[in-house]
Regions:
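Glycine-rich beta-strand-turn "strand-cap" elements at beta-sheet edges
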Residues: 1-5, 44-55, 84-105
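Short, well-ordered beta-strand segments in beta-rich or mixed alpha/beta enzyme
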Residues: 7-14, 44-74
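Short, surface-exposed ligand-recognition loops at beta-strand->loop->(often short) alpha-helix junctions
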Residues: 15-20
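Aromatic/hydrophobic pocket-lining residues that form π-stacking "cages" and hydrophobic walls in ligand
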Residues: 30
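An amphipathic, aromatic/His-enriched active-site/gating alpha helix that lines ligand/cofactor pockets
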Residues: 33-41, 63-97
Length: 105
């Protein structure tokens, strides 16, 4: 991975039943401090409701200036704190995809 290329991350969270609000609140605490990080360009939070709103998933779309900015993010106290709190509230591990641009603007 080129250190100077923008890094695009798509992370998906699937809460255990009855843990939707807790997961949502933990992720919400990440937004402001992450957006203040020098290398963060975008940190957007989304929700998907399926099966008559019974199944909910949350998704983060993140863009970092370069891989050093992503490394910095993953070493912050707010990142480490959120990871320690959220893991046991999820039905399965966080799905993290690092996207590589083929053709983008």
């Amino acid at each position: 991975m080129n250190k100077k290329s923008k890094i695009i991350v798509f992370a998906s969270f699937y809460p255990k039943k009855e843990k939707n609000n807790e997961v949502k609140e933990i992720i919400l605490t990440m937004i402001d401090p992450t957006r203040l990080e020098k290398g963060n360009e975008i940190y957007n939070f989304y929700e998907v409701k399926n099966d008559n709103d019974k199944e909910i998933s949350f998704h983060l779309f993140e863009i970092y200036k370069d891989s050093a900015a992503l490394d910095f993010h993953r070493n912050t106290s707010h990142y480490k704190n959120y990871r320690s709190k959220i893991t046991n509230l999820l039905d399965r591990p966080i799905e993290v995809k690092v996207l590589t641009s083929i053709n983008s603007i």
